[in-house]
Amino acid sequence: MENMNYYKKVMYFTFFLASCEDTELKDCAGVDGGNAICGCTDIVASNFDSLATFDDGSCEYLLNGIPIEWLKTYQVSNNSYYDESWKVISTFDGGFVIAGASDYKGLLIKTDPAGEKEWHQTYENSTTLYSVIEISDGGYVATGYYECDDMDCYPDLYLLKTDSEGAVEWEISDGTEENNEWAKDVIETDDEHLVITGVWNDDGWNSKAFLRKYTKNGELVWHKTFSNSTANEGNALMENSDNELIFVGYSGTQHGSYNHYMVKTDSDGNQIWKKKAQSIGDALLHSICPTPSGGFIAAGFCNSFRSNYLIERNNSGGKVWEDCFIDETSRYGYYDIVLSSDGGYFLIDELSHFVKIDANGDILYDIKLNHVNQSIIELEDGDIVIGGYGFREGNSGGPISLLRLNPSRINNKLK
């Protein structure tokens, strides 16, 4: 028995000494006998360490002094001036898909959760893709328009269904002769159909906003048009918990004088109510999202200076509040809005201002970013991803970009 106890003690101390020895011989990278210096090795990071030989994941990034998780840019054509991005969505696998255009062809880009590109596809039969969704079968549906190169061509709306790798499963172009039609947004409804909104022009100068419903195989179920003046357009669309449809855009004349336009229909596209709001100068709505109270909040611009604008309506269409944020310089309007999980809303405007407001529309912070100005989403972990760089009023295009940030880090910095 004594010999056995002695043996156990010898083995214990041998193991203990070996463990200590191993610890002493490993460097910060975990390499036996190594001499790595751990730190941030990314030269663009704010805490880049020129002496570091091993990246330990501690890199921090700043954009205009604001902490961000990462910023990625993607160039598809030979000249980034010909690349556009309009919409970004999160995907079932944690990655992202961007819809846009490259060299006048519709474009989809798929990335992993870190923003690294996995694939991109361009679509010869389209000119631009304004919106994209991932649907229940794991594929993607995107919409926009197609216009041929001839002088006598007019744009037609375009609807595309792909598999999970962006390969075409079916595509549709539709419109009227010698008139302009395009689609700006698409959703998948609870009954697994597709609904799009945009512009339909079937009698010359009088353009109408439209809703069109398709099966998931691309078969048209119904088509409805809506107008309040001679020029009307649907820009963004949503379905509520009652399976009703709400779209926003503008109503005005072919020469301007646009007014905010919001229409609610039943699930078959039959109008329940429509609302128009006037402003001094042009005014229109680019985006809509649900409110916790069951209503809707829409974002766009107002007045001759194209100031940022928000309006909230209840489920019956009654106005709850609105605000035209007049600034010293034109901001060209909010282009996207998303509900925040901790209350209030996040927005992005044309000049790349990232804004957080409370439930009453009061601004909590307004931060100037760069590179992104069209589309914003909140992830399950509370991080924000912003994408888009297109040909809007305040810029002339630029590299397709995707940015991820943690709002809590902004809150801490602003305290």
Show where each model-derived region lies.
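A sequence-level/structural motif corresponding to short, flexible coil/turn segments enriched
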Residues: L63-K415
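Primarily marks secretory-pathway-exposed extracellular/lumenal segments that are disulfide-
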Residues: M4-L71, Q75, G397, P407-L414
